[in-house]
């Protein structure tokens, strides 16, 4: 595969995450009203998706080691498109939650394989450079997801925001069929043996570096997705923004995420990995604390939320 093709594929495969989680958020209040669902039920369309996304990778990783990246990508993206279409057609919140759960598991195939492909094809230093270029593409997709979703919802209704990920998945699937060349040099026939799986997981869980960075990642994503799950209801129903205006607020957040990825490269050269991660932790803690203090003080406005999110999103981009 040509380097440009690899970067494009990686950007699309990684970008499927914000397409799936961010693009439909402006439509969440309208979706709830149309399906007669409570806010908690509607939020399950995100939390169930994320749970399936995380758990599926525990199985999809060994499957891709055994059978190769391309079969997992093909089956995963096909399932993603079908689940997205099922979500568009769902007549009830319960069926939508089921469709989104399948969509989350399928999304895991795309994101997991994208990172595995980098490891297959590149040495660590070269892989980091390729991944940084792909993450720039991811940043652009993340910036556009919520504004496009808000505009589509305002113009065509909430189901349009669920249809667009199906289109994105279909385009990505076509590119994988057309351009992707299997990246695993030697498939591992023992990858799915229970003993192999247990030994591998044991080695990983006993690694203190993994545990530390896993905790960091959980905190960073936990903070982000807790905000995402409630943000559309707060900004649209409480603060009175339109779907398009809400999308622009999310665009603001994504810009700071992209800025964080650039700041990360600069800080890595000056402070190393540990110093960079420590500084990102301080930023996230400062932003979250400020937001909490303002909320407890009764300050309710768009900027009381958007401004404290700046250091939080910077930190997320760094992490």
Where does each model-flagged region fall?
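Helix-breaking motifs and short loop linkers at transmembrane-helix boundaries and internal kinks
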Residues: 34-36, 68, 89-95, 106, ...
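Paired small-residue
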Residues: 79, 83-86, 94-102, 303-311
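C-terminal transmembrane helical hairpin of 12-TM major facilitator-type secondary transporters
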Residues: 277-319
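Helix-loop-helix hairpin linking two adjacent transmembrane segments in secondary transporters
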Residues: 91, 95, 124-126, 132-178
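Cytoplasmic helix-loop-helix junction between adjacent transmembrane helices
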Residues: 99-140
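Structural signature of the two symmetry-related core transmembrane helices
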Residues: 71-85, 275-291
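Conserved MFS/SLC helix-loop-helix module at the cytosolic interface between two early adjacent transmembrane helices
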Residues: 55-94
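Juxtamembrane intracellular "pre-TM" segments in multi-pass secondary transporters
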Residues: 183-213
């Amino acid at each position: 595969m040509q380097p440009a093709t690899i970067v494009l594929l990686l950007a699309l495969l990684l970008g499927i995450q914000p397409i799936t989680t961010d693009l439909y958020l402006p439509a969440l209040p309208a979706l709830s009203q149309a399906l007669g669902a409570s806010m908690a039920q509607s939020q399950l369309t995100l939390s169930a998706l994320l749970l399936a996304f995380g758990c599926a990778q525990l199985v999809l990783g060994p499957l891709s080691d055994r059978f190769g990246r391309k079969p997992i990508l093909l089956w995963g993206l096909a399932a993603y498109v079908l689940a997205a279409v099922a979500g568009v057609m769902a007549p009830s919140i319960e069926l939508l939650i089921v469709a989104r759960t399948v969509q989350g598991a399928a999304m895991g195939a795309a994101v997991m394989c994208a990172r595995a492909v980098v490891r297959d094809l590149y040495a660590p230093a070269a892989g980091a450079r390729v991944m940084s270029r792909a993450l720039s593409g991811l940043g652009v997709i993340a910036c556009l997801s919520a504004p496009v979703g808000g505009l589509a919802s305002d113009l065509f209704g909430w189901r349009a925001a669920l249809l667009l990920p199906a289109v994105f998945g279909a385009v990505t699937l076509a590119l994988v069929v057309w351009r992707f060349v299997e990246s695993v040099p030697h498939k591992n026939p023992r990858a799915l043996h229970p003993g192999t799986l247990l030994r591998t997981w044991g080695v990983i869980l006993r690694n203190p570096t993994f545990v530390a960075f896993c905790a960091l990642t959980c905190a960073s994503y936990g903070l982000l997705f807790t905000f995402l799950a409630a943000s559309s209801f707060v900004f649209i129903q409480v603060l009175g923004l339109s779907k398009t205006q809400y999308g622009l607020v999310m665009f603001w957040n994504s810009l700071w995420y992209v800025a964080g990825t650039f700041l990360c490269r600069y800080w890595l050269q000056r402070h190393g990995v540990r110093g960079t991660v420590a500084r990102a932790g301080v930023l996230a803690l400062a932003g979250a604390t400020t937001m909490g203090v303002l909320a407890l003080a009764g300050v309710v406005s768009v900027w009381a939320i958007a401004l404290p999110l700046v250091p939080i999103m910077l930190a997320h981009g760094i992490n």
